[in-house]
Amino acid sequence: VKIPVDRLLDPEFLKGRLGGPRGGGGDTTYFVVADSEGNVVSAIQSLYYHFGSLVTEPKYGITLNNRAADFSMSGVNEVAPRKRPLHTLSTMMVMRNGELELALGTSGAHYRPQQHVLMLTNIVDYGMNPVNAVNAPRFLWGIDGLIIEEGFEVTGLSVRHRLIKYPGSTGVASILANINGVKILYSDVRGDGAALGL
């Protein structure tokens, strides 16, 4: 791919971009890659704060994250040798008899673990196929109570909650499912993504 660097840095082009639509606040990327030999990579990367650490590796143009920002001078996240900061970056791979059944990942910050459980529950307990499990309305427990996407019948709920339109901003998931030896890939309708077979 030839990148038109001169055009992208042209002051007239940049002036035309000012005041236009702004991108979202997403800084997390998840991808799953599988080959015909059964190898699978389920990977997640997040800058954390906007522009991450503000350090970009010059040769490849990779901006480094600042996940260490959650360290503190005392308490459970105290800086110490061989310690990792609190964060929610995680992916999920489900195996059965040594064979991959599912690989799943999602953006969504502190909601990520809840989303993993919700989608896995949709598949295992409710018998949904992977596409329906990812697309299903979500409910997530947040600092301000429950966040519930349209599609649930909400009656008699005594805890504080907020209904949001479907599809909501509850994270963007991608999934690979191995069904009878056929790999199914799917990318969530809640954001930009793609499922490609090559």
Predicted regions mapped to residue ranges:
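Feature marks proteins synthesized as precursors that undergo proteolytic processing into two chains
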Residues: 1-198
